[in-house]
């Protein structure tokens, strides 16, 4: 099993072929490893951690919402989140007539604000409207979900970066540590063992899990 961790830049599709007439790039411009595919997608205008694997069962385990793997995002928004808005995100908001699953949300301030490289192109900035960073953890992945959730509470998303994936095995989360934009690395021997255990679980039962720490 071949498995990689990629820091996907802005403007790149989560696939290895370009779409005809599209302005977006593709993964082949950054990864030259054959026979690996994204286990869970990031929209072209989103950035961050993307796991690529040659194993179809691992793809299923990490993307099926029944298994409840927490994904954590850093979200730059227009406006300032108060506790009421954060609680709305935690409790769930209605998207396309369906309530989102309970989430984890907190306002990132001071040293907690992620030290990220500048985005290309840069995020739009308006002097009259402050921006803030939220950390949001979800256990499902509906289309444009993070953007729709923040918009529903009056905090439009400006920049979206997936920071980590929780394998729900009690070990550390897979994360962006030491991965610059556009760079990838193979999983470590220990990470590979954990992923192998994940797909070797013959019980095949969905996991309820617990919020990331």
Question: What residue ranges belong to the model's regions?
Answer:
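Long, low-complexity, intrinsically disordered segments
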Residues: 209-213
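RNA pseudouridine synthases
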Residues: 1-205
């Amino acid at each position: 099993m071949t498995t990689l961790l990629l820091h996907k830049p802005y403007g790149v599709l989560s696939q290895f072929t370009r779409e005809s007439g599209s302005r977006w790039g593709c993964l082949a411009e950054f990864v030259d490893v054959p026979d690996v595919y994204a286990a869970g997608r990031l929209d072209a205008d989103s950035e961050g951690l993307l796991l690529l694997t040659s194993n179809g069962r691992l793809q299923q385990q990490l993307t099926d919402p029944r298994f409840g793997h927490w994904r954590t995002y850093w979200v730059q928004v227009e406006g300032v989140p108060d506790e009421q808005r954060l609680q709305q995100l935690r409790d769930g908001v209605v998207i396309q007539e369906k309530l989102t699953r309970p989430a984890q949300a907190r306002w990132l301030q001071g040293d907690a604000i992620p030290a990220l490289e500048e985005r290309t192109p840069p995020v739009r900035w308006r002097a009259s409207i402050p921006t803030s960073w939220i950390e949001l953890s979800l256990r499902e992945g509906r289309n444009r979900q993070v953007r729709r959730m923040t918009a529903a509470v009056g905090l439009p998303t400006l920049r979206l970066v997936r920071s980590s994936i929780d394998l729900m095995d009690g070990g550390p989360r897979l994360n962006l540590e030491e991965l610059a934009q556009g760079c990838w690395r193979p999983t470590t021997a220990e990470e590979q063992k954990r992923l192998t255990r994940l797909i070797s679980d013959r019980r095949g039962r969905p996991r309820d899990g617990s919020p990331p720490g």
